[in-house]
Each structure stands twice: as C-alpha cells, then as structure tokens.
Regions:
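Conserved alpha-helix/loop element of class I SAM-dependent methyltransferases that forms part
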Residues: 121-139
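Conserved class I S-adenosyl-L-methionine
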Residues: 137-148
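S-adenosyl-L-methionine
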Residues: 167-206
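Conserved beta-strand signature within the Rossmann-like core of class I S-adenosyl-L-methionine
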Residues: 242-250
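A short glycine-rich, Lys/Arg-flanked "PGG" loop and its adjoining helix->strand segment in the class I
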Residues: 227-241
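N-terminal auxiliary segments of SAM/dcSAM-dependent transferases
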Residues: 2-101
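Conserved SAM-binding loop of SAM-dependent methyltransferases across substrates and taxa
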Residues: 149-161
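Conserved Class I S-adenosyl-L-methionine
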Residues: 257-274
Length: 274
C-alpha cells in the first residue's frame, strides 16, 4: 500500500474573473493599485497597474494584454516566476482544473467530463450534500474511495471524523490537487492518502475497520470495476456492522436505462448491504 504525502504548490491562482478588475482599469493614473480576488475566492491581493504592465506582490510583471487574454475556461497559477495554465495531456487523457464561478472551488475535468455537479451548485456544495448523507461523523474512522481533488475527505474531517483513509488511482489527479488552493486541507494529519487501485487497496485493509464508507467513483463507463459485485463485497467486509455506506451513482434522471440503478442496488444487497 503506497502512502502519498500531499504537498501544496505555493502560488496565486488567477482566472479570467479574478483579473476583471485589472482589465477594467483605465490608465487615468500613471500607477494604480488594484485589489484582486485570487485562489478561486479564498484570498485577495493588491497589484500595481503601471501603464501596460501589472506588477504582482513578489515583483513578477505580466503584460496587461496577456492578462486580458485569459480564458474563462482555464485557471492559471503563478509558479516560480511564471504564469502557468493548469491543464495537462498525459497518457491519452486531458486534465483541466476548471473554474466554475468567480469565488467557488474548481472542478477537475478529465477528457471533457467534470468530476462534480456544477448546475445550480458548486463543487463544494455538491460535496457537502453527499458527505452529509453519511450522518454524524464525529470520532469515526472513514474510508473515502476516489480522492479526486480531496473535497470529500476534507469535508469528512470538518464534520469531525477521527481519521480518513482516501484512495486515488491516478497520480495526475493528485497532482492537480496539489495545485488547487481548495485542496490544501489534504495536508491534515487525520487524512491518509493512498495512491493505488481501490480494487487492490481494499484487499489489504482489515475487516470491519471503518465506521463509514464514502464511495463516489467516476461514471460506470470509466470505472466499471468500482460498481462490481466483487468490489461491493470488499466494501461490505471493511465496513463495521451497523456502519453506513454512501455510494453516488450519478443523477438517476440522466440514466437512459433505469436497470443500471436496479443492478447497483441488487449487487449491494447480494453482498449484505440493506
């Protein structure tokens, strides 16, 4: 079982929205100080607009024309003196840390598929709704399958979990978590991140080790093994008797075949869940 140590990559995150105040500045004054919302709404900084250049607190100077070109669909981070777009193409997959609102946490998009619900809510609200389904977590030991950006593991700790073990298969996903200010809570000592295939990792866990299990996998077409009877059997084995499982399968209204939900329910019942 491979332990992953989370380390946040320092640097301000900018979006098209966060620099709108700068873009709107008219150069009436030779120099103007502008307050900018950064880190997807978590922080504010002051920058100096000097003609056609913008000077950030660390002294980095960026042309105003370049800031004007930032796309609403991307996030950018000031890392080691340069502004880097937060996307990646790796091993046939395209990853993007996607802004969804001016002051809301981002979602992770993989090959065009968002990892959170963003219609009439933001990724954090989506997470809170799901985690709340587990009920009170104070003092409990929680297994969190599919770390993603870490929002669910962070929310579980905020709800009082004594310890959270969260499992993520894709190192690129954890890389984007290291760039995301909203994921910084993953450095909490109560959270243990395991890098590995959940199918194999669960086999190494003790029986009846967890008070609650949070299972929010990618859609079935991307990770069918996480919906299998065999995997559900492992979830049942590691969950204490009387413990609670939350399993998100997507919005039922979006399933063209209701038999999918019925199949999930049947397999869960077959391994012992009620």
């Amino acid at each position: 079982m491979q332990r992953y140590v989370y380390r946040y990559v320092e640097g301000y995150v900018l979006t098209r929205w966060s620099v709108s105040n700068i873009i709107a500045c008219t150069s009436v004054k030779r120099e103007e100080v502008v307050e900018v919302v950064v880190d997807f709404g978590l922080s504010r900084i002051s920058v100096r607009v000097m003609g056609k250049e913008v000077v950030f607190p660390e002294g980095l100077t960026i042309p105003l024309d370049y800031l004007s070109s930032l796309s609403e669909n991307f996030a950018y981070k000031l890392i080691n003196g340069s502004l880097q777009r937060l996307d990646l193409f790796s091993e046939g997959k395209y990853y993007k840390l996607k802004p969804v609102a001016p002051t809301a946490p981002p979602t992770l998009e993989i090959n065009g598929v968002q990892m959170h619900r963003t219609t009439e809510m933001d990724p954090w609200k989506d997470t809170i709704i799901k985690v709340s389904a587990l009920g009170p977590l104070k003092g409990k030991n929680v297994l969190d399958v599919c770390t993603g950006l870490g929002y669910s593991a962070i929310a579980e700790v905020l709800k009082g979990a004594r310890h959270v073990t969260t499992v993520e298969k894709d190192p690129n996903v954890l890389y984007f978590a290291s760039l995301n200010p909203w994921s910084r809570g993953l450095d909490d000592e109560r959270i243990r991140i395991v890098l590995g295939d959940a199918v194999e990792v669960l086999k190494e866990l003790e029986s009846e080790e967890y008070d609650a299990v949070f299972h929010d996998p990618p859609r079935y077409s991307l990770a069918g093994e996480l919906y299998s009877r065999e995997f559900y059997s492992e979830l049942y084995r590691v969950l204490k008797r009387g413990g609670k499982l939350f399993h998100y399968t997507g919005e039922p209204s979006k399933h063209s075949n209701i038999s999918f939900i019925k199949g999930v329910k049947r397999r869960l019942e077959e391994v012992g869940f009620e």
